[in-house]
Structure formats: C-alpha cells, structure tokens
C-alpha cells in the first residue's frame, strides 16, 4: 500500500503543478516564473515538452505535401498578391550564373513583381544600413556553408521552371538540410563573438562574420537561439518609373517553392520551425534586408531568445503593404532590433554600426522570456454540485445550530403542539387545554390575534377569541354545560373532556366553586375539592381509624403500609412496649399473629405462647 500512496502523492503534485499555468491571449499556457527554480517541475516540463515535440513534428510532416507545391497562381490566395502569367520557360540565371552552379541544396529564387510598393519610414532609414547600387548579399546555404551569393541588382532570367517532381525533391532536400542553419551562429549562450569588417572579393557582400561585430559592446546574451521569422521577397522596379524598394527576408521556415511564372522570383513560406528544437542554438535572424540600388536599406536584425526544451513557433506578422519596421521584434518582451555592421559597396568601412543605446537592451533571455507550453489545458476537477437531499440536510443542520446557539442558555419547556418546535423561555411559552404552545402559535383562528392571557373559545377543534365567538355566530355550535345543560354563551371551562360553566364546576361535598382551584375526581367522575377528597376517600389508619391526610401546606400524603394495613407514622409502634418502629436495626418491626412487635417483645411473646 505504501507504493500506491507514493504514486498517488506524486500524481497529486503533478496535477497541482499543471493547475498553475496561466492562460495567455493566444490560447497557450505560461508557467509562473516562481516555479522555474523547482527541479521537479523542470524535469516534468522537459519530459512533457519532448513528447509534445514529437507530436508536433509528426503533424508538420503530414502537412508538408499540402503546403509544399501548388500549381499556377495557387499561392496568390495565401499571400494576397497576384503573380503574372508565365511567358517563357527556362533556367533562372543570377548575374550570369545558372541555377545549376548554385547547387541542388542551395536556395532557388525567382523574381516577382508586387502590386504594392514598399513604404519605408524615415525613422527606419535612420537606423538601417544603406547599400550601393550593385551590392550583393551573402546568404548561408542550407548546409551551413558561406559563399553562395545572390546578386541583388540583375536578374537576367526570362523563364521560370514549371512545377515538377524535381521541385518536390528540391524542397525535401532543403527541408532535410535546414538544420544547417544551426552552424550559422551569430551569438552563443555566454557572450557574443568578435566581429570585424571583412572585405570580400565582391564588394558589398554580407558574410556570416558580420555577427562578430557584437564584440564592440560585449553584450551577454544567454540562451540565444535562432528563429528566422520572415519570408524572402524580391521586387522589380522595371515596371514603373517610381523607385521601388526590393526587400529580402530570410524565410522563417526555409522551404522554397517554384511556380510556373516567368519574370517573377519569390520564395514561399512553409512550416519548418519544428527543425529548430533540441539543444539550445545561437542564431540571429535578419528581419528584412533591402538592396538593389543606393536607396536600398538593410533593416535592424535581432536575436531571439528561445528555449529549445520547449519547442514553440515565434511568428512574425507580414505587412500587407510590404512595409517593415526596424527595432521591433514579433515576440513579446524580446530585445529590440540591433543593426548589423555591414560594408558599403566601396568597402571603405561599415555603413552602420551597433549603437551604444542598444547595449542595455540585450539581457538575460531567461528573465525576458515567458515560456510557452504547447499543450492543451488540463481542466481542473470542479466539485460536483450537492444533491437536493444533501442541501436539505445542510439547511436543517444550520437551522438547528442557529437555534441551539440562540437558546443555549434559555430554559427548555418542551415542544409546541402546533409547530412541533422547541419552546425556550417562559416569555415564549403558553399553556392551554393541557398543551404547550408558542405565543405566536396559540392565536385566534379568525383574526390571528394572540390569545395568551385572554379568554378564548374552543369550538370544533378551533380556537377563537371572545369577540369572534360572541359576534360572529360561532356560538351556534357551542357546547352545552355538563351540569346544567344550557348553552355556554360566555366563558367555558373544560375538564375531563366535558364543558362546564365556570359557576357550575363545584365540589360535590362542600359545593365550593372550583374555578381556578385544584380539584380531583373519584372512580365515578365526581368532582371533589382536595380537602373533601381526603376526608371521604383518604385511607384510614388501622390503629386510630382516622383518615390519613396530607400535612398542612402540602398535597402529599405520607403513610406506612404493613400487613396490608395503613398506619400514620406516629401510630406505627410496638403494641407491647410502644417502641416507634422504622428501618433502623433496633427498631425493626417483627409482626406476629396480626400484631406489631419489636424484636424483644416478639421473643417474649413466643416464649409465653410455648409455655402455655
């Protein structure tokens, strides 16, 4: 039984821990920060998160065929922008390089012309780095290598690859190799690496070494993981004379679809955030990058603290007008965006550096972040409502307790005949017709007036006051007097189950009125006063032949019964020596031949009787 008790205790602890989750706006549940230092609760969270991660991974793998490839303009409904019809078909060439030179595991990008023009605020421009016209951006490959570049100015392709099985294979290859981003680390759990401006063979390229720029501030960033939370988009300004910003966003979920559209390059967005769980990784993701002409800007990048023990998905909302805001993160309570250190096209120095104002923003991610558990709520076991019988029993119990508390010190007289409740206190008691009532229960049946201390009439089981009885016709059914036989029109006296006029209720011996006086009756129901009753019906003493009456001032009669005879106490003596007999040893009675003797006289009487 001890084993079962321990299991029950552990289960109850687990349920109590789960009931401490606080509901958040997005439907998930967050853990109280005060419980983060509990080792048992941390172990429970770790096991629970591992199970939920497997389920989350299986669900995402099932949904990949549905979100991976669509034909024609199928993605226009998802992203709310239209794609132009395909004109020609052919391989995509970036700055003279075909897609075969990039490799099957690299990103395949396609141009796309948007209906809306990106609108960048002047405040955003002040915090972002400005690239020159023909700059190129270094992008990490899915395998974690650096060096594959995507030109930002010239896209000479006029044809787009139609969707085919090859596209599916490429997408699966990219999905399987998406973990290569883990090697592309820009920050670790202890401190940021040193970053120095690096001059590449091609000016304006941003390599992975630009994360080393965090050395200048030496900002600690614990438990920093990468979540890339945007989509890759390219704009083309050939359709209009207005300068158009070309935005480049690293995809948060790293899956690329090819569509049967020419002169359009785009990257579709799929759910692959499930690849970023496991050990705590360090990555920094760019919110949005602008390039293509001197007015293009690179927005501030940010590092998102993420606890891999609890896999979750940090989503960033996409602006419907393709605008972006630097310095803001899509996750609540995350550090503000910090601009990267990048070189301009001339390679003469960094176009923008990390501001000193941002050094205080990066703090311990454990203190800034609220952990989200991807679990369903565990409904607390609500108490079932009590049944009607239980509620009634509780009400009766409370009522009895209240009465006991209210009358614990009062005198208890008995139970009321009418309401069957206890009568406490002389001020609440009323006695009539040999029964006990509450003052509020003994009332007139017609007018409901209290009848305590007043004349009343009892007719056919009902009680009436004098006014209602005399002037309302109740006297027609009144009783007749048992002695005189007349109708009782005023007050009535009831005794022995009969009704009497008060003046007719008298002693049969002395004819004294017994209204309000103690009386008694004999076997023939004759009425006597107490004095006459004892004179006539009282037992007589066997010695003096006088009636044995009560002592003066009392109603009790004391007598001695011996040999079926009654004696006064004073008459109960030895007939020979006149010794008073009682229960004492020397005064005990020893009757012989109908005579009362003491012990000595009894022996003498026996000796004389034997001699004779």
Curated annotation (Swiss-Prot):
It is found in: Cytoplasm; Nucleus. It comes from the Eukaryota. It holds the Pfam family LIM. Residues 414-475, 479-539, 540-608 form the LIM zinc-binding domain. GO terms for cellular component: adherens junction; nucleus; P-body; transcription regulator complex. GO terms for molecular function: metal ion binding; transcription corepressor activity. Keywords: Cytoplasm, LIM domain, Metal-binding, Nucleus, Repeat, Repressor, Transcription, Transcription regulation, Zinc. CDD domains: LIM1_Ajuba_like, LIM2_Ajuba_like, LIM3_Ajuba_like. PROSITE patterns: LIM_DOMAIN_1 (PS00478), LIM_DOMAIN_2 (PS50023). GO terms for biological process: cytoskeleton organization; negative regulation of hippo signaling; neural crest cell development; regulation of DNA-templated transcription; response to hypoxia. The keyword Ion transport does not apply. Acts as a transcriptional corepressor for snai1 and snai2/slug and plays a role in regulating neural crest development. Belongs to the zyxin/ajuba family. Interacts with snai1. This is LIM domain-containing protein 1. It comes from Xenopus laevis (African clawed frog). The lineage of its organism: Eukaryota, Metazoa, Chordata, Craniata, Vertebrata.
């Amino acid at each position: 039984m001890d084993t079962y008790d321990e299991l029950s205790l552990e289960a109850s602890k687990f349920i109590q821990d789960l009931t401490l989750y606080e509901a958040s706006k997005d439907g998930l549940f967050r853990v109280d920060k005060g419980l983060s230092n509990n080792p048992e609760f941390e172990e429970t969270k770790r096991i629970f998160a591992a199970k939920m991660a497997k389920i989350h991974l299986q669900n995402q793998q099932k949904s990949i065929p549905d979100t991976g490839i669509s034909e024609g303009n199928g993605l226009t409904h998802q992203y709310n922008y239209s794609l132009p019809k395909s004109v020609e078909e052919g391989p995509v060439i970036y700055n003279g390089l075909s897609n075969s030179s990039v490799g099957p595991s690299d990103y395949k990008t396609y141009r796309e012309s948007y209906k809306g023009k990106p609108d960048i605020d002047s405040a955003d421009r002040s915090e972002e780095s400005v690239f020159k016209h023909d700059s190129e951006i270094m992008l990490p490959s899915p395998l974690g290598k650096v060096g594959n570049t995507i030109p930002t100015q010239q896209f000479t392709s006029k044809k787009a690859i139609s969707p085919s099985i090859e596209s599916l294979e490429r997408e699966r290859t990219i999905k399987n190799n998406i973990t290569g981003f883990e090697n592309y680390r820009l920050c670790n759990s202890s401190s940021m690496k040193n970053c120095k401006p690096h001059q590449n063979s091609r000016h304006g390229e941003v390599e992975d070494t630009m994360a080393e720029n965090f050395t200048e501030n030496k900002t600690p960033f614990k438990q920093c993981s990468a979540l890339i939370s945007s989509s890759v988009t390219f704009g083309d300004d050939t359709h209009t004379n207005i300068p158009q910003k070309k935005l480049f966003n690293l995809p948060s979920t790293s899956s690329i679809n090819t569509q049967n559209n020419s002169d359009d390059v785009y990257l579709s967005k799929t759910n692959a955030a499930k690849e970023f769980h496991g050990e705590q990784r360090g990555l920094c993701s760019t919110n949005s990058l602008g390039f293509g002409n001197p007015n293009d800007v690179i927005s501030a990048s940010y590092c998102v603290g993420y606890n891999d023990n609890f896999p979750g998905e940090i989503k960033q909302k996409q602006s419907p007008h393709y605008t972006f805001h630097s310095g803001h993160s899509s996750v609540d309570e995350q550090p503000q965006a910090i601009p990267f250190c990048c070189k301009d096209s001339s390679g003469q120095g960094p176009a923008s550096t990390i501001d000193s104002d941002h050094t205080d923003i990066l703090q311990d991610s454990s203190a800034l972040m609220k952990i989200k558990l991807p679990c369903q709520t565990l409904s607390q076991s609500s108490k079932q409502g009590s049944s009607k019988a239980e509620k009634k029993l509780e009400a009766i119990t409370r009522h009895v307790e209240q009465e006991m508390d209210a009358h614990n010190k009062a005198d208890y007289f008995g139970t009321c005949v009418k309401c069957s409740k206890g009568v406490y206190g002389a001020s609440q008691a009323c006695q009539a017709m040999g029964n006990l009532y509450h003052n509020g229960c003994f009332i007139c049946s017609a007018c409901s007036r209290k009848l305590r201390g007043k004349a009343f009439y009892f007719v056919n089981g009902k009680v009436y006051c004098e006014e209602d009885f005399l002037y309302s016709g109740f006297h027609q059914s009144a009783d007749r007097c048992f002695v005189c036989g007349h109708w009782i029109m005023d007050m009535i006296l009831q005794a022995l189950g009969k009704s009497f006029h008060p003046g007719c209720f008298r002693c049969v011996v002395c004819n004294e009125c017994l209204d309000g006086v103690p009386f008694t009756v004999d076997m023939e129901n004759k009425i006597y006063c107490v004095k006459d009753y004892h004179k006539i019906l009282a037992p007589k003493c066997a010695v003096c032949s006088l009636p044995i009456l009560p002592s003066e001032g009392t109603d009790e009669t004391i007598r001695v019964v011996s040999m079926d005879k009654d004696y006064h106490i004073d008459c109960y003596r030895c007939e020979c020596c006149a010794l008073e007999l009682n229960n004492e040893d020397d005064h005990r009675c020893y009757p012989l031949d109908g005579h009362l003797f003491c012990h000595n006289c009894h022996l003498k009487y026996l000796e004389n009787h034997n001699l004779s």
